[in-house]
Regions:
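Short pre-catalytic strand/loop immediately N-terminal to key active-site residues, enriched for Gly-Thr
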Residues: 23-33, 261-265
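Residue-level signal for short, function-critical loop segments
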Residues: 5, 65-67, 200-202
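Metal-dependent amide/peptide-bond hydrolase catalytic core
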Residues: 96-97, 105, 112-279
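Glycine-rich, phosphate-binding/catalytic loops in enzymes
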Residues: 16-20, 78-80, 110
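Acidic/His- and Gly-rich active-site-bordering loop/insert found
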Residues: 1-29, 49-55, 252
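Acidic/histidine-rich catalytic neighborhood of metal-dependent amide-processing enzymes
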Residues: 34-108, 171-176
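Short, small-residue-enriched loops and turns at beta-alpha junctions
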Residues: 8-9, 68-70, 100, 234-239
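Short glycine-aspartate micro-motif
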Residues: 26, 89-93, 112-114
Length: 279
């Protein structure tokens, strides 16, 4: 049974305190993602205990503290979670769902990528001439446009350049996703950095997409160079027959209790989660 204790709100966010509302609900950082799921996990175990169903059962509760930003290296930060999954027949993630009549059978994995581009710093009067070339900013535009034209439209695959810096001189602080850039309109850009993410439904889809991105990055405009680096984060949790069989049991229980059938939710509408490491 998997949950997490951290939230997406940084220390400098004004949204920091829990507040009880008059209608018996609460609001605060992490109440939806995923304090509510943690409470359901706890009371499900309480109900099983009161019913005497925990005797001779092996149930592992895993509550991580770095789900929103996974600790590195992943091989260490998720080692215990993976080992717990190997000892279990079924793994359930209590991350917030989309209602009582939907469950998540598949989740996309996530990967980071970074493109670093170099051009020749020259006066802009000579741009496109031999020995000057296109500059780093034009090369960044080519790469991003080729990513868009080549990769968009594939089922469950998304990719996003979240931040870009370009000019004569740039500095980028990755932990905070902030940076500075300096350039002049009459100087051909020397440097560009692009930071983005990639979402995929299977490891095969991830590797095929990475190969296409590498090929695009290598096809440079004159007098420019570029390299792309990938960073693994969450693996994909592809749909499996075992997950579909488990859904049938969930749905039958829901119907028996008068709540109607339970259906699978579209994985393209869900983010990555710790349950994927177990799957």
């Amino acid at each position: 049974l998997i949950g997490h204790l951290d939230t997406v709100f940084p220390e400098n966010s004004p949204f920091q305190k829990m507040e009880r509302l008059p209608d018996s609900t609460v609001k605060g950082p992490g109440t939806n993602d995923m304090k509510g799921g943690n409470v359901i996990l706890l009371f499900a175990l309480k109900a099983l205990h009161e019913a005497g169903e925990l005797t001779d059962a092996q149930i592992i509760v895993a509550l991580t503290g770095d789900e929103e930003l996974t600790g590195k290296p992943i091989s260490l930060s998720r080692k215990d979670l993976i080992e717990a999954g190997q000892r279990s027949d079924i793994a359930l993630g209590f991350e917030n769902s989309t209602g009582f009549n939907n469950v998540t059978l598949a989740r996309r994995g996530s990967s980071g990528w970074k493109v670093e581009i170099k051009g020749k710093r020259r006066h802009s009067a000579g741009i496109f001439l031999t020995g000057v070339g296109a500059g780093a900013v034009f090369e960044s535009g080519r790469i991003l446009n080729d990513f868009y034209e080549t990769l968009k439209g594939e089922t469950y695959l998304t990719f996003n350049p979240g931040i870009i810096l370009g000019g004569t001189e740039i500095s980028y602080h990755e932990p905070s996703n902030t940076g500075n850039a300096f350039g002049k309109t009459n100087v051909v850009a020397q440097s560009v950095i692009i930071d983005g993410d990639l979402r995929f439904i299977s490891e095969e889809q991830k590797e095929i997409t990475r190969a296409k991105m590498r090929a695009i990055v290598a096809n440079n405009l004159p007098e420019t160079s570029a390299k792309i680096t990938f960073f693994d984060s969450y693996p994909a949790m592809p749909p499996t027959q075992e997950n579909k069989d488990l859904l049938k049991k969930f749905s039958k229980v829901s119907i028996d209790m008068g709540h109607g059938p339970v259906e699978a939710w579209d994985p393209s509408k869900r983010g990555a989660a710790d349950v994927s490491f177990v799957a």
